[in-house]
Regions:
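Acidic, metal-coordinating catalytic segment for phosphate/diphosphate chemistry
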Residues: 1-28
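Short connector loops at helix/strand junctions that flank enzyme active sites
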Residues: 24, 44-46, 51, 78, ...
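A generic structural micro-feature
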Residues: 19-23, 98-105, 122-125
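Active-site-adjacent beta-strand/loop module that shapes the phosphate/pyrophosphate-binding cleft
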Residues: 87-117
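Nudix hydrolase/Nudix homology domain
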Residues: 47-48, 118-163
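Conserved Nudix-box catalytic region and its N-terminal flanking loop in Nudix hydrolases
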Residues: 33-73
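A short coil-to-beta-strand element that immediately follows conserved catalytic motifs
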Residues: 77-87
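Short, well-ordered beta-strand micro-motif
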Residues: 31, 108-112, 129
Length: 163
């Protein structure tokens, strides 16, 4: 079960900062099964299909954040993760549907080992399923194709992607 928005680090910071632009540090995770299908979640806030992702909380590492988000949004337990891309910079600034602006710093992780059964509906999701890349549903978050393309490059070069 996830913590409430008001109790989250970003929620508490937003309450103090008002409408000022905030830095948002988060993680995104790519979970694949043996046939190569990718796990996507359908977000309950905007209906988009996306990779499991979310904000880092005080007291956890960025890898812990990825593991926690996978658990909260899919029910799976990520046993081993490795970072493959960092997304930073002012071009990563986003205003959400509530009018709050964030400059986003995201670390993308490959989940190398996991166990459990997918929970299709959670506090943050309305669905979660594995899809072949050529059969992704709409509406699809713009971060999905970019992240998967970067994972492909990482797996060919073994070099961290910096954007």
């Amino acid at each position: 079960m996830s913590i409430s928005w008001a109790d989250s680090y970003v929620g508490q910071l937003r309450a103090l900062a008002g409408d000022r632009t905030l830095m948002f540090v988060g993680a995104r995770a790519v979970v694949r099964e043996n046939a190569g299908r990718v796990l996507l979640i359908q977000r309950s806030d905007n209906g988009q299909w996306a990779l499991p992702a979310g904000a880092m909380e005080l007291g956890e590492s960025i890898a812990d954040c990825a593991v926690r988000e996978v658990r909260e949004e899919t029910g799976l337990r990520a046993l081993r993760v490795s970072a493959f891309a960092l997304y930073t910079g002012p071009d990563r600034t986003h205003t959400n549907m509530y009018g709050h602006t964030y400059q986003i710093f995201t670390t993308a992780f490959r989940v190398e080992d996991w166990d459990g059964e997918v929970t299709r509906v959670t506090d943050e999701t309305t669905d979660a399923r594995f899809f072949h890349r050529d059969q992704f549903p709409a509406p699809l978050s713009a971060s999905v194709p970019e992240t998967l393309a970067d994972l492909d490059v990482f797996e060919q070069t073994n070099r961290l992607i910096l954007k």
